Amino acid sequence: MVNTLRVILWDEEIGRLAWDEHRRLSYFTYNPESLKKGIDVSPLQAPVRGIRAMTPVWGEDAKMYQKLPAFLADSLPDAWGNQLFELWRIQNHIPNADITPLDKLSFIGKRGMGALEFLPEVAKTDKAEKIDVKSLADLAERIFFERENAHIMPEESITMQSLLTVGTSAGGRQPKAIIAINKTTGEIRSDQVAGLQDYDYYILKFGDTKYSSAEIEMTYYEMAIKSGIDMMPFCLPRTMAFGVLMQSSGK
């Protein structure tokens, strides 16, 4: 169980997030050096000026915040990420009672969709591993439908690790992954290393062999473009295991 996390913004520690076992709540305290810079990450709930900046920001009891301060709760994994996290917890024989929201943030680590990062990391990797998208899509679909009953075969352990790496931070209910694609060779890697040369970053939304969700999403994208709405580029590559790609700026 993780009891304390460093909260990082733009490579600097802005504060610490800790878990109070007695109150069963987390609380955030600012780093004094960060306060001097005046960067307001949450001006309404946790302003960096005035007396409130010197007091802990306690987590919220409402279910949607999962015992975290509201401005940190948005970094938690969403429905699909939670599904992967739960499978990881079961595989590692960790009792559910031992899990706190800090464990989930530690699991996200540096892979969150926003600017905030949480250290130390669980399942840390510093390499942009090559990815077999077809195997990834097949496993993602099975986990999505079988949930915690999904059984991961020994030969699938590498694919499962890849899915945990690229899939837990992407929000939403449907299976998806954040990947990097080489513009010249088409080689696909995980998004773990920012600024890979000759690579573009994408959100890969896995389709469903039972329901044409990717095609439907692509249709709505095309309608939005024709209506004059400015959107990130989408594409529907047939080689991507029934998935749809949305370009990302990377992290």
PLM regions and their residue ranges:
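Phosphate/dinucleotide-binding and metal-coordinating scaffold of catalytic cores
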Residues: 1-251
